[in-house]
Amino acid sequence: SLWVWIFAFFLYDFCYYWMHRLHHEVKVLWATHVVHHHGEEFNLSTALRQTSTGFLWKWIFYLPIFIVGIPPEVFVTVAGINLVYQFWVHTEHIPKLGWYEYVFVSPSNHRIHHAQNKHYVDANYGGVFIFWDRLFGTYKEELDELKPIYGTAKPLRSWNPFKANLDIFAEMIKDSTRTKSIKNKIKVWFSRPNWRPDDVKVSHPIYKNDLDNFEPYNPSTSFEVKIYSWIQLFFIMGLSAAVTASVTSQSFQDTSIFAITLLITSTIALMSMEKYELSFLPEILRSSAVILSLIHI
């Protein structure tokens, strides 16, 4: 019935709020979400910046939806609507929307969610409805006198997708290994994201952004590397379109080969943009992957 759909829509967003909030408050969860916040620009592409490890924990938070008997097709539909809604709020070009800000997630209150300013952090977790944040005390309003600075307090300073997805996991492993306290070896994983053992903070300090002198990550790149990267981008777009168009007729092995080729190509192209010149060995690896995929076709 219509009431089932309405109930499911609200329940999904309620579960999303708590899933999202805890992914900002528990480090092992934050490790699977941080990729979405690494971006130091705020635009629609930020919405597409998604982690590869989110599947590890997120499903747990939606179990109540199935426990109360919501049909799978209803769950998938409301989840899709919720996800699509979140796309448009990743923009700086839409100002505050008056009464809308009191009920729904908007570009203004979502800009705060992505800001690393001390006044703004840990706020506005809703997916569609912002009243969850107002109800549970996590709402913060965008101030005219304080422009949001986007990104994470501990900057990634890289376009390497492997580093982005594994950076916090690596930090937790190192900190839990280095600290002398048995208690802290466990606490590292379940603490707040900014917490580190005192002995490790002293022996292995981590650089944090100076927001008074903040500059987004934008390494200088030679003209040749830019041309190379554009060529790789067009190749990636073409192969992605071809794979998508024929995915129903592909075997799992075929799809896996194409996916690995795209992953290697895009990663090497991104890493090349961080240097003035191409690296010989990665380019050999990329070319080999392309040749093998073409032979397989």
Task: Locate the predicted segments by residue.
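Short, charged cytosolic
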Residues: 21-30, 189-210
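Structural signature of hydrophobic alpha-helical transmembrane segments
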Residues: 250-261
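Conserved small/polar residues in nucleotide/adenosyl-binding loops
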Residues: 295-297
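A membrane-cytosol interface segment of integral membrane proteins
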Residues: 147-195
